[in-house]
Amino acid sequence: MNKSEQLFEQAQKIIPGGVNSPVRAFNGVGGTPCFIKRAQGAYIYDADDKAYIDYVGSWGPMILGHNHPAILEAVITTAKNGLSFGAPTEIEITMAEKVRELVPSMESLRMVSSGTEATMSAIRLARGYTGRDKILKFEGCYHGHADALLVKAGSGALTLGVPNSPGIPEDFAKHTLTVSYNNIDEVKEIFAKYADEIACIIVEPVAGNMNCIPPVEGFLEGLRDVCDQYSSVLIFDEVMTGFRVALGGAQAHYNIKPDLTTLGKVIGGGMPVGAFGGKQEIMDYIAPVGPVYQAGTLSGNPIAMAAGLASLTELAQGNKHQQLSSATEKLAMGLKAAAERNGVSLSVNYVGAMFGFFFTEDKNPITTYEQATQCDGEMFKRFFHLMLDEGVYLAPSSYETGFLSTSHTDDIIEKTLVAADKCFAQL
């Protein structure tokens, strides 16, 4: 029994499922999760000190790689002055100004402690601003574990939502409408039916929780038009895509301006940070200046602000996103070529520093949740464990996006592709 197996056995006696977030349990791939004790650059090291090339990056935050010196220095320096005050600090202002500089649509913003808090608060704000109850989300898009968002489609696109988890009252979930991602016609149909009842659309501009599925041409533009037509709020959930698809997020990459934006992951540089913001007139509805309540003991925590500010400052220097995009393309296309050499049918998607691959015979681009669910999950499980044995750590679920960092050099990507070629040959 290795150290991870020992720790997992111990953890299950005190922590539900042995983990503090379900996907970490390896239920999607089987086997024992790797317990990590340290990380550096593009590598993580398990409890037995085995090294892995890391394409999870703490599920997205580590865009500069692990243990970046600028972030560590900022955290250590700030921590010497105190860990938390529960009062305003200057660094909160500096951080907010930096975010607005990079994401101009966020004219005003509020810091929180997680992406879930950000999306939950943005939806409450949209409801308060519009005076409407219903929200529209997309099948396969994840926006955190707030009750209103753990909802899947009922029987048909135009039916009311039903809960996707025990503990969510159906009477509450009925206010969440769900339609197919990348299908603007369904959006128009449901708005025609519910018209002035819908407070907002919330969308991952690049869907990252059904693997990696970019928007089809015209989809985001269509959402903007529908929201304008019906005076609903367009919320871009950029918790995953923010500062990763482009320096200004997916909204900069696709040149679409939402009314509200939610951020997380990269904005914290590895610390627990989220944010939501947008049009000044909407943000003026949030307490203490407006009637919509939102609060948080650790919101704007100085250590987290320091880490996030250092991360964004470093990320904005040079042409890092051009390098990230090139590296991601090299990896994704290299995986596809390696699969083809070994007679394995593989579809790949990538945008910015996000990538995904699907074991499928479908020759069409993967653009929908339905297509993603029809891919070969069993083959992914085998490939995942083969790659793990080769020292490559992929997301332990076929529905999760992969992430690159500036620490993923050409040599590291080439090493990954050599391992992949070997693993595809064994499928």
From Swiss-Prot:
Keywords: Cytoplasm, Isomerase, Porphyrin biosynthesis, Pyridoxal phosphate. The modification N6-(pyridoxal phosphate)lysine is found at residue 265. It comes from the Bacteria. It catalyses: (S)-4-amino-5-oxopentanoate = 5-aminolevulinate. SUPFAM superfamilies: PLP-dependent transferases (SSF53383). GO terms for molecular function: glutamate-1-semialdehyde 2,1-aminomutase activity; pyridoxal phosphate binding; transaminase activity. Gene3D superfamilies: Aspartate Aminotransferase, domain 1, Type I PLP-dependent aspartate aminotransferase-like (Major domain). The keyword Isomerase applies. CDD domains: OAT_like (cd00610). Its EC number is 5.4.3.8. Pathway: Porphyrin-containing compound metabolism; protoporphyrin-IX biosynthesis; 5-aminolevulinate from L-glutamyl-tRNA(Glu): step 2/2. GO terms for biological process: protoporphyrinogen IX biosynthetic process. GO terms for cellular component: cytoplasm. The keyword Ubl conjugation does not apply. It is found in: Cytoplasm. Its cofactor is pyridoxal 5'-phosphate. Disulfide bonds: none annotated. Belongs to the class-III pyridoxal-phosphate-dependent aminotransferase family. HemL subfamily. Homodimer. HAMAP family: HemL_aminotrans_3. This is Glutamate-1-semialdehyde 2,1-aminomutase. It comes from Colwellia psychrerythraea (strain 34H / ATCC BAA-681).
